[in-house]
From Swiss-Prot:
GO molecular function, one term: metallopeptidase activity
Domain MPN residue range list: 103-225
Family according to the record: Belongs to the UPF0758 family.
Stated name of the protein: UPF0758 protein BCB4264_A4572
PANTHER family: DNA REPAIR PROTEIN RADC, UPF0758 PROTEIN YEES-RELATED
Sequence motif: JAMM motif, positions: 174-187
Keyword tRNA processing carried by entry: no
GO biological processes: proteolysis
Origin species: Bacillus cereus (strain B4264)
Length: 225
């Protein structure tokens, strides 16, 4: 009887959540709670397994489109919408933790502030953090999306927002979708150009952080600033 009870318990993730807390559930079980029901052909846990397999786990699932989700047999508009809403809430909660005038004292602080948001992006995003005199983030702006080079990253776009926000300094960041944050020659060239412009204008570019997968490189620490 105990064996049967254990099997039933494993097949009831919502009940496990209520008894043991959400932290005790696996990824497939949490997904099953969001989906609520399976299909005529398979249980909700089997459907969860299929989704995780399709997207190679959570890494790619978080950026799944509506079309990609409903292409999976057993997932309709309703289930796909529930999943996408849950993923977006998760992203917003991560941002909330750091939104209230987050202070940056080191490259590690900066990487921590943006890592979870940027490390899974499938295209390069060039982002600027605008700081006040206390090194607190007063604004964040995505300057452009695409491969980084000196012809695309124009200082005018970077510093225009700094003037609008009365920023004292800027930290630039961009991600490498490959997961490897090693700076390229273009990364270094863009950084030096922005630093030079900042010196002329009087708004210091403090650092340029390259985000990889759970790792980062500070161009200031590498001696390029």
């Amino acid at each position: 009887m105990n064996g049967i009870r254990d099997v039933v318990r494993e097949e009831q993730p919502r009940e496990r959540l209520l008894l043991e807390g959400a932290g005790s559930l696996s990824n497939r079980e949490l997904l099953a709670v969001l989906l609520r029901t399976g299909s005529k052909e398979e249980t909700v846990l089997k459907l969860s397994d299929k989704i995780l397999h399709q997207f190679d786990g959570l890494r790619m699932l978080k950026d799944a489109t509506l079309e990609e989700l409903i292409s999976i047999h057993g997932i309709g508009i309703s289930k796909a919408s529930q999943l996408m809403a849950a993923f977006e809430l998760g992203r917003r909660m991560v941002r909330l933790e750091y939104q209230n005038r987050y202070s940056i004292r080191s490259p590690e602080d900066c990487a921590k502030y943006m890592m979870e948001e940027m490390r899974f992006l499938q295209q390069e995003h060039f982002v600027c953090l605008y700081l006040n005199t206390k090194n607190q983030v007063i604004h964040r702006q995505t300057i452009f999306i695409g491969s980084l080079n000196t012809s695309i990253v124009h200082p005018r776009e970077v510093f225009k927002e700094a003037f609008r926000r009365a920023a004292a300094s800027i930290i630039c960041l961009h991600n490498h979708p490959s997961g490897d944050p090693t700076p390229s020659r273009e990364d270094i060239a863009v950084t030096k150009r922005l630093v030079e412009c900042g010196q002329i204008i009087g708004i210091e570019v403090l650092d340029h952080i390259i985000i990889g997968d759970h790792k980062f490189v500070s161009l200031k620490e590498k001696g390029h600033i």
